[in-house]
């Protein structure tokens, strides 16, 4: 009875953010996950779960595999590289698709549906640094135990960014001492708030105690400041005497740390139109120091095109002031709210019938592939939804089993709607 019904597109992405705890030796490119069930929740031991967005793939495959389900023509769009700039959605050829209604299954809160999202891009700031052979005491500094999280959805939680906090510690010791930067690495993804960061500095032997005390004092202040949002934050300093190694010159060490401190991070502006919605933000997700210099990778987001343009200019001008280079890639459009949406109206009505209450329709400060696909398919009507998934992009990620079952039944009712 669905021969004349309009087709529906089911959509999600198959890649995941691959985070793991420091003591996990799993190869995230090759090894499977060790799944755990604790009550109503499923998680992965020592790693991210990949419910974002493996659940969409699971939903779609289950529906396609079940011949007993009544539905119109279904089209399943499964993209790659969503977590690194939505490259799959940007590159996909949509000419074969016939559907004008798209159900995106990349949201993480049952009962909250998305009808609009921010646009954004990635930024890569590189600074060439000179190195010399230096001898002295090596202090290895490790910041760990931060909460982390998704750099869009959880940027408003006030959580510490390990990369930014490490640069703050280094700022306090470099400005008052002859310190050489030997290593600086933190974070794995530009769109995840980094939970850990490691740095190594070389100091004169007679300055060791003074510098160590300065590090510990800075760390103490940070722990007090972030006691609520990052209760498990810890800073460890290991000392190795009599080290002779290549390290960044004092002048360039100062310049690198000053650049990081000068560049913005976090919320830039709240929405003027929607209460409690972040309009513009950025996240310093990755820092890496190698033979050529230091590289900073940011994720930028905004629901206002002019604000994103201004933020890019700000990063560019600050970088150039420190003789660094800023590049921007992977820009994706914002998904604008559609005033008239039959799909949204149907989904609200079906949800109310099943749950006895209306769902919440929201905009989100994060990238959703709906914006890119809506720009490719004229007249596309999109809604994003999903089951309860908590702490995505972190090793604490966990998925509600009962919510997953309820939302599956909900999806079946949505696709059965003519």
Go through the PLM ranges and name each one.
Residues 4-84, 89-91, 96-100, 122, ...:
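Active-site metal-coordination/substrate-binding segment of hydrolases
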Residues 33-47, 147-149, 352-357, 388-393:
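Glycine/charged-rich beta-loop-alpha catalytic/anionic-binding loops adjacent to active sites
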Residues 71-162, 170, 174:
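Fold-level recognition of mixed alpha/beta catalytic cores in primary-metabolism enzymes, strongest
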Residues 95, 159-176, 203-208, 254-261, ...:
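His/Asp/Glu-rich mid-to-C-terminal helical/loop segments that flank catalytic regions of hydrolases
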Residues 132-136, 155-185, 192, 205-281:
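Acidic-enriched catalytic cores of C-N bond-cleaving enzymes acting on peptides and small amides
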Residues 154, 161-164, 168-184, 337-380:
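Active-site-adjacent substrate-binding region
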Residues 198-200, 234-247, 285-287, 295-305, ...:
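A short beta-alpha structural unit
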Residues 272, 279-292, 299, 358-413:
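Zn-dependent metallopeptidase/amidohydrolase metal-coordination segment
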């Amino acid at each position: 009875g669905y021969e004349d019904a309009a087709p529906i597109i089911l959509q999600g992405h198959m890649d995941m953010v691959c985070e793991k705890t420091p003591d996990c030796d799993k190869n995230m490119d090759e090894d499977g996950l060790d799944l755990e069930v604790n009550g109503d929740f499923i998680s992965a031991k020592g790693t991210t779960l990949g419910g974002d967005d493996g659940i969409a793939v699971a939903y779609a495959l289950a529906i396609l595999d079940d011949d007993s389900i009544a539905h119109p023509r279904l089209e399943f769009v499964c993209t790659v590289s969503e977590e690194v700039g939505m490259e799959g959605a940007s590159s996909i050829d949509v000419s074969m698709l016939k559907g004008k209604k798209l159900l995106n299954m990349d949201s993480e809160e049952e009962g909250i549906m998305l009808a609009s999202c921010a646009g954004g891009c990635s930024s890569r700031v590189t600074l060439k640094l000179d190195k010399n052979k230096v001898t002295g005491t090596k202090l290895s500094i490790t910041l760990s135990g931060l909460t982390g999280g998704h750099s869009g959805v959880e940027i408003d939680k006030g959580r510490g960014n390990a990369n930014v906090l490490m640069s703050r510690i280094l700022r306090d010791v470099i400005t008052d001492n002859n310190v050489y930067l030997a290593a600086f690495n933190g974070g794995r993804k530009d769109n995840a708030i980094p939970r850990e960061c490691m740095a190594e500095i070389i100091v004169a032997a007679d300055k060791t105690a003074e510098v160590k005390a300065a590090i510990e004092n800075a760390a103490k202040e940070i722990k007090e400041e972030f006691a609520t949002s990052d209760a498990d934050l810890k800073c460890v300093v290991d000392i190795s005497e009599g080290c002779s190694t290549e390290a960044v010159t004092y002048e360039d060490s100062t310049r690198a740390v000053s650049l990081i401190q000068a560049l913005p991070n976090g919320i830039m502006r709240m929405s003027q139109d929607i209460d409690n919605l972040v309009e513009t933000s950025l996240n310093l997700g990755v820092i890496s120091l190698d033979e050529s210099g230091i590289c900073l990778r940011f994720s930028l987001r905004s629901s206002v095109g002019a604000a994103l343009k201004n933020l890019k200019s700000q990063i560019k001008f600050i970088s150039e002031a420190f003789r660094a280079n800023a590049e921007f890639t992977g820009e994706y459009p914002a998904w604008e709210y559609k005033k008239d949406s039959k799909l949204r109206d149907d989904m609200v009505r079906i949800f109310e019938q099943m749950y006895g209450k209306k769902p919440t329709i929201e905009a989100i400060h994060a990238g959703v592939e709906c914006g890119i696909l809506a720009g490719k398919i004229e007249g596309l009507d999109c809604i994003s939804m999903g089951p309860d998934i908590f702490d995505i992009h972190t090793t604490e990620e966990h998925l509600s089993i009962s919510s997953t079952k309820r939302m599956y039944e909900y999806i079946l009712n949505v696709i059965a709607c003519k």
